[in-house]
């Protein structure tokens, strides 16, 4: 226990691990080998729902738990940018970093695959977060999301300060920045 909080062990299950009658929180498995188990989370509250993918690739289990969610928070890795970084690291002889850039492409989802999953799951809004590499300028953001809007147009590329509000008893999704 720290600062009055008690750690609990969470096991993925069809049933919520927390349910107070209003808020239900469900943990589910995602694919992030070599790290296993890895979890995603679904929060259901008074008719609204948010899903956090955690680090993962496209999977049927994530698709199942994202079904009809108001908002899907999806981590994303730009395969294009990362593969360029990998080649740059190789060209300067930094084999360690080049290997990392190569390996991470196997256990993170691309923005386009995230968009495909959101569309198939009938998600209302997709928020890309935990971005690799984080696009720090608008041109990089355009490269990061290239082709996404052709698959799923209702998305946000989050940064520090992105604020998402789902008013209860509503279908509205409010996206703003607190910066």
Where are these regions (language model features)?
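Cap/insert and terminal regions of metallo-dependent hydrolase folds
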Residues: 40, 49, 57-160
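Core dinuclear metal-dependent hydrolase active-site scaffold
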Residues: 2-67, 163-179
């Amino acid at each position: 226990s720290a600062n009055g909080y008690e750690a609990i062990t969470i096991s993925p299950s069809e049933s919520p691990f927390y349910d107070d009658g209003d808020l239900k929180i469900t943990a589910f498995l995602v694919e992030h080998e070599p790290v296993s188990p890895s979890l995603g989370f679904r929060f259901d509250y008074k008719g609204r729902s948010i899903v956090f993918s955690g680090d993962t690739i496209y999977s049927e289990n994530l698709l199942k738990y994202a079904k009809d969610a108001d908002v899907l928070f999806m981590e994303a890795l730009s395969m294009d940018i990362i593969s360029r970084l990998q080649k740059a690291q190789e060209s300067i002889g930094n084999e360690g970093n080049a290997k990392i850039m190569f390996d991470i492409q196997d256990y993170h989802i691309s923005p386009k695959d995230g968009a495909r999953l959101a569309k198939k799951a009938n998600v209302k809004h997709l928020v890309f977060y935990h971005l690799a590499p984080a696009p720090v300028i608008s041109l990089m953001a355009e490269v990061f999301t290239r082709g996404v809007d052709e698959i799923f147009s209702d998305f946000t590329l989050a940064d520090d300060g992105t604020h998402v509000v789902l008013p209860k008893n509503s279908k509205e999704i409010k996206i703003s920045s607190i910066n």
